Amino acid sequence: MNPYGNSTLPSGVRSRRINNVNGLTVHLLEAGYEVTGRPVVLLLHGFPELAYSWRKVMLPLASAGYHVIAPDQRGYGRTTGWDDSYDADPDPFRPLNMVRDAMGLVYALGYRSVVSVVGHDAGSPVASWCALVRPDIFRSVVLMSAPYEGVPSLPFNIANGAAPPRPAPTDDEIDAQLAKLERPRKYYQRWYRTREANDDMMRAPQGLHAFFRAYYHYKSADWKANKPFPLKARIADELAKMPTYYVMDRDKGMAETVAPEMPSAAEITACKWLTEAEVGVYAMEYGRTGFTGALQGYRVRRGDDPKSMAELRTFSDRSIDVPSCFIAGKRDWGVYQTPGAVDRMQSAACTQMRDLHLVEGAGHWVQQEQPDEVSRLLIGFLQHQAHVADNREK
């Protein structure tokens, strides 16, 4: 097997494996490991990404005095111990077990807490649950691209006549609405739960490398039509205003969806935030593992999954009470794909929301597109929390 990153990792970022982490052998990248006793920052990637997606911010964080840890999450990359079959039990990918994965890694490395857990895209809900469930371990949280809107509530006071909460439309209900539009559409997260999704992307007619290049380009600030805005409601007519990487044409898979947005040779040459060698890392790793493990989370962590809903209702009415920050690209539709989520995050779900930053010149891949600015924002947030903690101790 080739070295992780195909020699594109920055010097000072190392790759290693840790055994016996909640049933996994976890592959991780780390920086700032040379000095013991440093405060820890845990970085959780999204889909279709890897620990590798954090490579550009790890050294700046390490230079600021942190031990920086970025694992390939369950289902991804070179972390092993999960089943790559669509017919496998998806329960290990449920919210609380993903929290146990994060806890197990922190403990295995000899730490009792981290100063912050940072999650991007599909890593954002995992980071949210970590901060919600174990604030004693995860002392602050930074969410990127995917806002946290809180846990599902248990019906309150219904014995005395109060109306039960009105459930939000499920992905299946939204998908059925989208199918009835004049231009029939489908919701990408609903499609990601299907058996066909893995084969569609693995066997992309354009090849896996070209698939990743087009997919990353289409969701980045380089695709000039990414001009997101708040949607009025989670209904088909509103959701259909988003690009097809989120609300796909009904008759197309993701490979066919992104193919027309393949950048030109000149655009690829001009793309300094994601070189051809770096695209090759994603193509190599996913070419080896497939997408099924990474997609399992969509099957069990969406809001209409009964088991996950029941699991999360244990924390009904509980908020994230550790210091929180939200960072996303200014041209990232992920901020708005769930209407009202940002407002709920700021007003109720996170009681200590310190900052909300929309970064210029970035789409969905904010820490890769604008790593210097993201590093600056992360370090500023972390140093502010350290300053506040120092003042409390005086």
Regions found by a protein language model. Name each.
Residues 20, 32-36, 318-320:
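Short, flexible hinge/linker loops that cap or flank conserved catalytic cores
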Residues 15, 68-70, 356-358:
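Conserved beta-strand scaffold positions in the cores of enzyme catalytic domains, especially
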Residues 352-394:
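Catalytic active-site module of serine/aspartate enzymes centered on a nucleophile-bearing elbow/loop
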